[in-house]
């Protein structure tokens, strides 16, 4: 479902994902002022910056959904949208907007479902989201799901023939966040997409890419895992209420999302480093070295640079148990903070920022090689999920904006 963009301003309609700018209420206040008096997806969602007002806002949101579903949104049946998103840096990220089957999704660590979470799901974060979704008439996606398609067989062929497709929308995004242009995907292109996805999900493709004999992993949730987990939780509620057979035909069985190729050149993975406060720096380094020396895993050798004051030392881990250096670091910190409750861990974007923080008293920085894109799927398959706060996918201004809607009742 989309509004008629001949009558509705796309720039005012589309707003960024609710989990962005959570500590910057002034951003959201500016959005409120900018969209005042216009049809906007801001009316249909709850920014996390306003969670302290959720009891008042949720009924308003649900009422807006009913009004918009009846008087603003137009239905486009059986449609998929090819999206070209010009980011704030000028690069174009390409994606497909469509539905995934929640029967094929399991957010639990160690799952062997076709759709899996990339990071551990915090179960406590699901009930509040389910409460919002339970009475919602429509959904909007900020979920971004990744496919591992190095040969670019699914999305990129559409880009080469996009001009032959009907344009769904074409407008600038608010707050200097770039531009979006969407196209309705034709039936013949849909067939090509499904065929290419079938090949990616084959056992042969899994063995060739990852060197493992494991259940196929086609879709890895990059952004919005807790939203997708909430959709799954509500769908499970509905199944219990109406029975499995009836649930197979219920619209809540599916969830709207954007599918992006992991290998899209506009998609950046930025490592998230660690700063540890309130520790004796020398003892911390000694404890970390002892921990690493006792590991007996079979992952490839890793290196972690420990920085504090004006010193640094690179610790080599010959036999790590985690596929990623960040996993080794996080496993150590989980153990360390249990025996050192005074230690506080923070998750830091940027090497320079980490080094600067580590100059502080009783503070240590931990730097390591970021995860390459090629490691994402293999790590989820082998380790069950990535360590928390492994990587960031781009800046807030380049996250998904709410544009498309879908009925779930």
Where are the regions that the model predicts?
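Catalytic or ion-translocation cores adjacent to nucleophile or general acid/base/metal-coordination motifs
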Residues: 225-288
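Compact, glycine/acidic-enriched structural inserts
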Residues: 159-185, 264, 269-294
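Short, contiguous, pocket-lining structural segments
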Residues: 137, 185, 189, 219-226
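C-terminal catalytic or substrate-handling cores of phosphate/nucleotide-
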Residues: 276-390
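Short beta-strand segments
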Residues: 146, 221-222, 258, 367-368
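N-terminal extension/subdomain marker
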Residues: 1-176, 205-208, 216, 362, ...
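Glycine-rich phosphate-binding "P-loop"
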Residues: 173-195, 317-321
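Active-site beta-strand/loop microenvironment that shapes enzyme catalytic pockets
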Residues: 199-242
